[in-house]
Amino acid sequence: VADCDVLVLARYMQILSAEFTDQWVMKIINIHHSFLPAFVGADPYRQAYEKGVKLIGATAHYVTADLDQGPIIEQDVKRVDHRYTVTELRQLGAEVERQVLARAVLWHVEDRIIVFGNKTVVFE
């Protein structure tokens, strides 16, 4: 693991310790299945459904000791309405998650991201 340039968390669903994240500053990328800062933590599609949202999304971000609070690398959304079930939201969101995570990892390995405070600048 010591020779890795990036760690990618896809459906990992575990909280990393501060000791671990401090060793990998801005080198761990997580995909969160909501448009952060909305619906932090577990089961965001259910949270979105219960709020009756009109957009669902995904966020790729660098992992910090604070859950789902790291600098955002990429986000995208899809429009939904009251007819969508939680299962349908998850299915639609899965494709958004794949696209967002792929772009974030690509930009990271191509050194196209600068982190400034808790924000990122991504060069195209």
Regions found by a protein language model. Give the residues of each.
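Glycine-rich phosphate-binding loop signature in dinucleotide/nucleotide-binding domains
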Residues: 1-4
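Donor/substrate-binding cores of folate-linked one-carbon enzymes
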Residues: 6-124
